[in-house]
Amino acid sequence: MSDPLSDIEWRVEPGQVQYRTALDAMDARNAAIAAGDARELIWLLEHPPVYTAGTSANAAELLDPRFEVVEAGRGGRYTYHGPGQRVGYALLDLRKRGKDVRRFVHAIEDWVIATLRTFGVESWSVDGRVGIWTKDIDGAEAKIGAIGVRVRRWVTMHGFSVNLDPDLSHFAGIVPCGIDEFGVTSLARLGISLAPEEWDAALQGRAGQFLAQLEGEPL
């Protein structure tokens, strides 16, 4: 059986990457993939504290811009990235995967949900409410992961973030993804101590299922 990742670069960044640097790198790689000059890429990394604005961002939801605010070009509204949060960028060519953006988003969601389940965390997506959700320590529903994508020339950009152990107070500077009636949580808040390497390995272990789902197979 062939390795589903054999034609895809799997890159794990050892240190923090400035958000603008990552954005420029994604733009260049997107163009190269679309032109047939580069392999597809799944990129795992961490950013210094930053607020990013999606194409639907509402300035009223930027409550306290204590960190740099960067226009991301992805769909969605404001989100926060910072230390303790694992970010995954997927630059994949949908021209050979049915050109189905909705299926791509659902596959990303299911990939994150399946990986969280590895560590005993049940999570879910909700129609009309962007993100990955779980039950917080007080029993209330809270966001543990964010989803935001862009597709240009049928090549995807951006992807997801999952809260391993970020400073959750940093989310108070925005209304995360425009949803103010729910809180934000993390694996650490749920009592699970997890190194980024452990998360990355579990995610990679489910990458084949994620790619199969992009081909139209159920996860």
Curated annotation (Swiss-Prot):
Compartments reported by the entry: Cytoplasm
CDD domains: LipB
Family matches, as Gene3D superfamilies: Bira Bifunctional Protein, Domain 2
Active-site residues from the entry: C177
Catalytic activity annotation: octanoyl-[ACP] + L-lysyl-[protein] = N(6)-octanoyl-L-lysyl-[protein] + holo-[ACP] + H(+)
Record domain BPL/LPL catalytic: where: 36-215
GO cellular component, one term: cytoplasm
HAMAP family per UniProt: LipB (MF_00013)
Note in the entry: In the reaction, the free carboxyl group of octanoic acid is attached via an amide linkage to the epsilon-amino group of a specific lysine residue of lipoyl domains of lipoate-dependent enzymes.
Family affiliation: Belongs to the LipB family.
NCBIfam families tied to this protein: lipB, PRK14341.1, PRK14345.1
Function: Catalyzes the transfer of endogenously produced octanoic acid from octanoyl-acyl-carrier-protein onto the lipoyl domains of lipoate-dependent enzymes. Lipoyl-ACP can also act as a substrate although octanoyl-ACP is likely to be the physiological substrate.
Record-given protein name: Octanoyltransferase
Phylogenetic placement of the source organism: Bacteria, Pseudomonadati, Pseudomonadota, Alphaproteobacteria, Sphingomonadales
Gene: lipB
